Design a protein with these regions (language model features):
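Conserved C-terminal "switch" segment of AAA+ ATPases
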Residues: 152, 189-195, 208-209, 222-289, ...
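Short acidic, glycine/proline-rich loop/turn micro-motifs
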Residues: 164-168, 300-302, 348-351
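Flexible hinge/switch segments at interdomain interfaces of large molecular machines
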Residues: 41-47, 112-117, 246, 285-298, ...
Length: 505
């Protein structure tokens, strides 16, 4: 017979004594382990010896922003030049604009040109689950920058800690971090040679306290580059690449309207990859064109479509291209294809003649006609429409909405806006507003139907070419169009001064 040497009372006493100690020991161990996992490598000085130096020559397409930062650089180089005239140099510079426009590159160039120590960090590095850690890291960063002045502190994605305070208990850590940043910026004295730079894609979300004078004194808009800027950026990113004799940077710049510097750098890199894939010695124009199509519309996809669908697709894209040609220089056709890319089964590419910032009502109507021409071609040729025009309808709806709601291009309110969030509008006015929007889209579709019917022969010829070759470039397209007369010249009238008859006054 086996006997247990300890009584039940002894075991119970042991458990009562030691279980709470073991439990709390495990809790403390888990807490210490969790805190040890918190990243300790936080904002630190960038070592120029281990990074590629960036100067003003590497920054293109942002001349206005560059000039603003050059003044900051001049202050860090020769502060007495400003002090003897009583000038107060901005404490902070906020760079804002869409992603990929070169905000970080500008900050790096400014630091390198000034010779100042450069501290770079993302704002998300200051946000932690433990209260007070973000504020402590802000204090440490600014203390180190002051110790190593002259210095530039760059905080990317500033909206992560700089968004407007809500006052909620769950945002306490965020608010403490932001408050500490505000305190540190206020703490810069006249002897400080530290400039803080921030970058954000969402200026409207930042706390107003950050934007007041004395903190981020200068707010610099870093917008997507214009035609000249895109030309300069492409030259910067291709200067170390062997280019073929047929490469025309000017044409590439015209074809990339609306793209950012990051997009253009990606295009230059993709073109080099295309050339290397084909074991070429030089990068050709066709490599850049393929790179642009890949960046803009995605990978080429050879979907298996039926002959019936292929025919519908050919007439749809031919309708877009035909009406675009008839509209003159509003949307000059560069290429038409029924080879799918990304989510699109077919595409028509347009080459803007120049960068435009002002558009007339007639031009916007012409753009709507082009967008609806694919659907119009389907209806006229096949007697029915497909879901292939979904994105076209969305684009047309956005244009018509803007014309009525924002641009005052309707008969019901030609001298004021009628935004969707304007709750002061009566129900009758809202109904009239929606009716005016529908009238614009309906009129554009009726015009597209008329143009397609009138030029059916040219439509058939263009669709036949697409069915035969799948892709038609600009030269082939113009040859198919022949001497077809244009139906609209709205773009040619922009900026033309209308003479008034003195007798009519």
């Amino acid at each position: 017979m086996v006997t247990w040497p300890h009584s039940v009372d002894d075991i119970g006493g042991f458990l009562i004594t030691w279980l709470p100690i073991i439990f709390f020991g495990i809790i403390i161990w888990l807490l210490l382990r969790t805190m040890s996992l918190v990243p300790k490598v936080k904002p630190a000085m960038v070592d120029r010896d281990t990074t590629d130096p960036v100067g003003w020559g590497d920054v293109a397409g942002a001349d206005e922003a560059k000039e603003e930062l050059k003044e900051v650089v001049e202050f860090l180089r020769d502060r007495k030049k400003f002090e003897r005239l009583g000038a107060r140099v901005p404490k902070g510079v906020l760079l804002y604009g869409p992603p990929g426009t070169g905000k970080t590159l500008l900050a790096k160039a400014a630091a390198n040109e000034s010779g100042a120590n450069f501290y770079s960090s993302s704002a998300s590095a200051f946000v932690e689950m433990f209260a007070g850690l973000g504020a402590a890291r802000i204090r440490k960063l600014f203390a180190e920058a002051r110790k190593n002045a002259p210095a530039i502190i760059f905080i990317d994605e500033l909206d992560a800690i700089g968004s407007a305070r809500s006052g909620g208990a769950h945002n306490r850590e965020h608010d403490q971090t932001l408050n500490q940043l505000l305190v540190e910026m206020d703490g810069f004295g006249g002897a400080d040679e530290v400039v803080i730079m921030g970058a954000s894609n969402r200026l409207q979300d930042l706390d107003p306290a950050l934007l007041r004078p004395g903190r981020f004194d200068r707010q610099v808009n870093v917008a997507p580059p214009d035609l000249i800027g895109r030309d300069e950026i492409l030259r910067v990113h291709t200067r170390s690449k062997p280019l073929g004799a047929d490469v025309d940077i000017g044409v590439l710049a015209r074809r990339t309207a609306g793209l950012t510097g990051a997009d253009l750098a990606n295009i230059a890199n993709e073109a080099a990859i295309f050339a290397a894939r084909n074991d070429q010695q030089y990068i050709r124009q066709v490599d850049f064109e393929g790179a642009m199509e890949r960046v803009l519309t995605g990978l080429q996809k050879r979907r298996v479509v039926t002959e019936k669908e292929k025919r519908i697709l050919a007439y749809h894209e031919a309708g877009h291209a035909l009406v675009a040609y008839l509209m003159g220089d509003v949307m000059p056709v560069q290429k038409v294809t029924i080879v799918g890319r990304g989510d699109a089964l077919g595409l028509a590419y347009y080459l803007p003649v120049e960068d435009r910032y002002l558009h007339t009502k007639e031009e916007l109507l012409d753009v709507m006609k082009v967008a609806l021409a694919g659907r119009a071609a389907e209806e006229i040729v096949f007697g029915r429409v497909t879901n292939g025009a979904a994105s076209d309808l969305e684009k047309v709806t956005e244009i018509a909405r803007a014309m009525v709601f924002e641009f005052g291009m309707s008969d019901i309110a030609p001298s004021r806006t009628m935004r969707a969030d304007n709750y002061a509008l009566s129900e009758e006015t809202k109904r009239m507003r929606d009716s005016a929007q529908a009238q614009l889209t309906d009129h554009a579709y009726e015009e597209a139907l008329r143009l397609i019917s009138k030029h059916r022969v040219s439509l058939d010829r263009l669709a036949g070419g697409l069915l035969e070759r799948e892709t038609i470039d600009r030269e082939e397209f113009l040859a198919i169009m022949g001497d077809l007369p244009r139906e609209s010249r709205s773009a040619e009238t922009v900026g033309t001064v209308r003479a008034l008859d003195a007798e009519a006054l």
